[in-house]
């Protein structure tokens, strides 16, 4: 495997340091064994998320100085609008403060209580907004996506037979829309093939069902298509992205990932009537339709960053840096979700902590142990993130119980990946020392963000 060097020079740095293990243990205890509740100053290498943790370019910083902070009609909005229309091909764009702002708008605009939303695996905030507006989420991702050890391409594809069965059983009129994520975060950052997007479009169009993409990591998805799908090897990333969205009616976007910024998002659609309603609704929750809760400078940085993300050298390095970490861990026998996706390496906590049951929260405990032993912050993505069934109150029990090592864009080097790998490999050699956890505080909504735990 060829791992390309960073396609950038570092112009500004932030000093970080490793606090002693006994202090890390104390900090973890104070945080209730929830890595979300740690203070960033106590983190050596922060792999909690790739959301808003990107390093911006010199051109983006220059653009920040060109912020038009007019309350309405900001020139930066029009720059962002033109950029998204050109690259994605959608007719309308509504800016939001981040991705979940767009999820909130779409859910209110598109869902009637009692309808179904089908998608290729749930995501935490996305499903929350869908259910909050009365929908029932139905997972129609291919079965292979739930098998952590299965190494095949495009595990994020929608199972067309599952989709057809849902249409036959529930009726097309009772399906609000299809939520197609590119890539599928909780499956390990798995991509969706262009062939599958095209097939989903053909099937839904025949039944009058709309398709909205979660476009958060669309550039990473495009890279996998270029790398692995026949007929796209000679196409540019921008060309692939544009074709991807030609099979959708709109999308939600968290600009904090593939737009290479620290804040921002947007909702896209082609339907004029929906756009009119979205402009009315965004004023209530975000702000004027020309800023959506964002400063002008942030919209400018997002427009510039989205173009930078289309550069092949950037996205090749981005994906292969993640793959480098995964390959090191796999070579040492550490169980991971395969194949390695575009934004993170997912540790398979079921196999890593095989001495713990799912009710002992192995992924949560593993994430806490990783911080204590290595100074690296990661994130639980298992039963805690899945939450509870709204009707029964029982835990959702995902087949995948993982810890996500999420790599921020343009922030860390291969040397940092070596440090992460070495620390986790060492921890794996003493995995039986990892103890199970129990709730001492469980929030009712999106519990993984603020829950607290203690050892059983």
Curated annotation (Swiss-Prot):
NAD is among the record's keywords: no
Gene3D superfamilies: Aspartate Aminotransferase, domain 1 (3.90.1150.10), Type I PLP-dependent aspartate aminotransferase-like (Major domain) (3.40.640.10)
Documented EC number(s): 4.1.99.2
BP GO terms, sorted: tyrosine metabolic process
GO molecular function: tyrosine phenol-lyase activity
Modification N6-(pyridoxal phosphate)lysine occurs at: 257
Keyword vocabulary terms for this entry: Lyase, Pyridoxal phosphate
First-level EC class: lyase
Ranges in coiled-coil conformation: none
Pfam family, one: Beta_elim_lyase
Disulfides per UniProt: none
PROSITE patterns from the UniProt entry: BETA_ELIM_LYASE
InterPro entries referenced in this protein's UniProt entry, alphabetically: ArAA_b-elim_lyase/Thr_aldolase, Beta-eliminating_lyase, PyrdxlP-dep_Trfase, PyrdxlP-dep_Trfase_major, PyrdxlP-dep_Trfase_small, Tryptophanase_CS, Tyr_phenol_ly
Keyword Membrane in annotation: no
Cofactor(s) named in the record: pyridoxal 5'-phosphate
Substrates-to-products reaction catalysed: L-tyrosine + H2O = phenol + pyruvate + NH4(+)
Top-level lineage group: Bacteria
HAMAP family: Tyr_phenol_lyase
Subunit structure: Homotetramer.
Entry similarity comment: Belongs to the beta-eliminating lyase family.
Name this polypeptide is given: Tyrosine phenol-lyase
């Amino acid at each position: 495997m060829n791992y390309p060097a960073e396609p950038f020079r570092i112009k500004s740095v932030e000093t970080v340091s490793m606090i002693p293990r006994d202090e890390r243990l104390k900090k973890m205890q104070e945080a209730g064994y929830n890595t979300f509740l740690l203070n960033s100053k106590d983190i050596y290498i922060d792999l909690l998320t790739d959301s808003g943790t990107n390093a911006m370019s010199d051109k983006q910083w220059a653009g920040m100085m060109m912020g038009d902070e007019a309350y309405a009609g900001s020139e930066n909005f029009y720059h962002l609008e033109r950029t998204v229309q050109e690259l994605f091909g959608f007719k309308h764009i509504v800016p939001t403060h981040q991705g979940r702002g767009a999820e909130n708008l779409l859910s209110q605009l598109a869902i009637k209580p009692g309808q179904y939303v089908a998608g290729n695996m749930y995501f935490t905030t996305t499903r929350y907004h869908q259910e909050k507006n009365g929908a029932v989420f139905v997972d129609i991702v291919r079965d292979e996506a739930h098998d952590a050890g299965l190494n095949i391409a495009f595990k994020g594809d929608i199972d067309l037979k599952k989709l057809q069965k849902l249409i036959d059983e529930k009726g097309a009129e009772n399906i609000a829309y299809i939520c197609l994520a590119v890539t599928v975060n909780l499956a390990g950052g798995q991509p969706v093939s262009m062939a599958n997007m095209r097939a989903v479009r053909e099937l839904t169009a025949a039944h009058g069902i709309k398709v909205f993409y979660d476009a958060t990591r669309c550039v990473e998805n495009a890279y996998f298509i270029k790398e692995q799908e026949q007929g796209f090897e000679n196409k540019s990333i921008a060309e692939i992205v544009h074709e991807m969205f030609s099979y959708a009616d709109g999308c939600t976007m968290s600009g904090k990932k593939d737009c290479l910024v620290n804040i921002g998002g947007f909702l896209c659609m082609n339907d004029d009537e929906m756009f009119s309603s979205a402009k009315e609704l965004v004023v209530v929750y975000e702000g004027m339709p020309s800023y959506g809760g964002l400063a002008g400078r942030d919209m400018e940085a997002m427009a510039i960053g989205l173009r930078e993300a289309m550069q092949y050298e950037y996205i090749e390095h981005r994906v292969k840096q993640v793959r480098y970490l995964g390959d090191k861990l796999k070579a040492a026998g550490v169980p991971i979700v395969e194949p390695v996706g575009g934004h993170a390496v997912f540790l398979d906590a079921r196999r890593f902590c095989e001495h713990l049951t799912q009710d002992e929260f192995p992924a949560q405990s593993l994430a806490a142990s990783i911080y204590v032993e290595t100074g690296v912050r990661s994130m639980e993505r298992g039963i805690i993130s899945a939450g509870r069934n709204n009707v029964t109150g029982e835990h959702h029990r995902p087949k995948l119980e993982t810890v996500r090592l999420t790599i921020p864009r343009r922030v860390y080097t291969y040397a940092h990946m070596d440090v992460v790998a070495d620390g986790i490999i060492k921890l794996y050699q003493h995995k039986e020392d990892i103890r199970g956890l129990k709730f001492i505080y469980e929030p009712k909504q999106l519990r993984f963000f603020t829950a607290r735990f203690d050892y059983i």
